[in-house]
């Protein structure tokens, strides 16, 4: 078929969300969306494909899957899989080739990717979800709000407290007495974000400098402006060195679409049927 009629579909299956991006032959994003999957990955992906079908009609796509929960599904559907670090690197190469370091926070993982002279080094957190999106959700519930509520509080902070972000249990031990003592929610919210920054920098960079052009990727850094500001403040970045793309929460999905070899075309509807019949 005509390559111009074949779109690429990137699917990112994360620990808490599913993201999709459909690109045209000029690698422009025609459709993108994301949804929390609550462990119902196939159902969630089917819903997202349904939305794409509603908007774009019965198009042909060449899909590629990435993400921590993507390999099993890729095998299941007979669709190519690409490692997330490769997907993200490809998207950055396309959007912001000047990137020196990328900081990516997900629902249950955190990564720092260094780009040095053609080499790519990825550092990732271990089994604990401290300092990630789910940690932020957990801390927000202590303040009887959600992540976006935490973000609103943090906009008006006046003081920062020391909170351990390496573990939700330790953080709770730090926060509860402050709540009991009447600490302002604004200050606690900003302190939680600062704890995430400290955990990411000390736990992942481990002394290796984060400098040059820094890209902020992943849902928490996309949706939570004050978390992003806490990183910028701590790393002392000026505007010229901050890379915060409009689609930063979809970068792995976009990057996986960019990795498509365009050799596995299928109808969106067929893909949806495969998900619903397995």
Place the predicted regions along the sequence by residue.
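Glycine-rich phosphate-binding loop plus the immediately following alpha-helix
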Residues: 41, 117-159, 258-262
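Adenine-nucleotide phosphate-binding core of ATP-dependent small-molecule kinases
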Residues: 171-206, 249
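Glycine-rich phosphate-binding/hydrolytic loop that grips phosphoryl groups
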Residues: 136-137, 243-277
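Phosphate/pyrophosphate-binding loops at sites that engage ATP/ADP/AMP, CoA/4′-phosphopantetheine
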Residues: 48-61, 200-212
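Short beta-strand-loop/turn "lid" adjacent to the catalytic site in phosphate-handling enzymes
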Residues: 25-27, 34-37, 52-86, 114-122
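Short glycine-rich, Thr/Ser-proximal phosphate-binding strand/loop in the N-terminal lobe
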Residues: 5-43, 47, 121-122, 126
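Conserved phosphate-binding/catalytic loops in two-lobed NTP-binding clefts
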Residues: 81-85, 231-254
